[in-house]
Amino acid sequence: MNERGDYGDKADGWFAALDDSIAPVAADLRSLVRKAVPDATECIKWGTPNYEKDGAICAIRSGKEFVALQFGPIGTSLEDPDGLLEGTGKAMRHVKIRAKTDLKKQLFSSWIKQAATANLK
């Protein structure tokens, strides 16, 4: 049984509860994921919105002053020519976005699509 109580919930409440300083960034990321993989499912897992289609694609996490787009289990294999992805784990990587101007929509969309495609292999 899930001890968190939110596992599998819809993500609307999570987005609504965000601080006004980061909510617009999170909303843009959510929209980006939905456009990149329209048939991905969105639900709360581990307290944060997760996106799946035939396996994990990505998650959106929040910090005090940023929103992170997180990739695992293929985070380390994503093409990252600008070195934006952070993390030291075996597979997971994330990028922190502090303002809407930091959104690299084309690159992030590419990563999201790479993650979704990796699940088909």
Language model: regions and residue ranges:
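Charge-dense, helix-prone N-terminal extensions
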Residues: 1-121
